[in-house]
Amino acid sequence: MGIMTSFKARSAAAKISKGDIDGAMKLYKEAIDEGLTDVRYLLSYSVLLIRNSRFGEARELLVKIQKYPMAEDNRRQLFVNYASCVYKMGEMQKALDILERQHQKAASGLVYETLGYLYVEANETEKALAFNTEACEYDDEDSICLDNLAQTYYRLLNDKTKAKVYFDKAIAIKAGQIDTLYFLSKYDLEAGDQAAARAKLEKALTGRFSPLNYATKDMVEQEIAKL
């Protein structure tokens, strides 16, 4: 791996921090074509591919680099990214199996966040409740885990009162969290406060949507259009 290849990878990472995602992806692709082997940057590129719904490309890249030497936290990130890909490609059970194996090896916030959300998506009510409760005990300031538990109560148990407790905790920690804003806007609408609902939805629109968001950009825009 040459000096220019490393420079392109570092430049790509810098572009991400400045919000230039297209520029970052272009530089990462050039660096990979030139033989980039730094796992940190390859994982970063896989995340960009996933966020742009290029799941097949991300999966292919992750399979390629899984044999590379890497730190344990990077390997965990690789498996989480891979599970996200196969989930979005229609292989929910495979994604769950991968993440459950990772959780058995060691507890981590990243796995709690991702597996907890997938349990909700899979309508695994008992597992979702137990796991997301455990996740919030593991880290009661993880806004994603709090949102996962809130969604468990809201979507699977139809307990909106209990759900709101955790949505409120999540939004207090991360004010711009897309899914939390989306669900809290529904409480505003039920209370007849359209202005508050609109404010939350418009704030959600400014966020960076992920394939692991329940609320898509289209869903948020449609809700705003109804107001």
Where are these regions (language model features)?
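Short coil turns that delineate tetratricopeptide repeat
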Residues: 36, 70-73, 106-107, 140, ...
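Position-specific recognition of the canonical hydrophobic site in helix A of tetratricopeptide repeat
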Residues: 16, 50, 87, 120, ...
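TPR alpha-solenoid repeat register
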Residues: 41, 75-78, 111-112, 145, ...
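Residue-level recognition of tetratricopeptide repeat
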Residues: 13, 47, 84, 117, ...
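TPR/TPR-like (Sel1-like) alpha-helical repeat modules
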Residues: 67, 172-175, 186-212
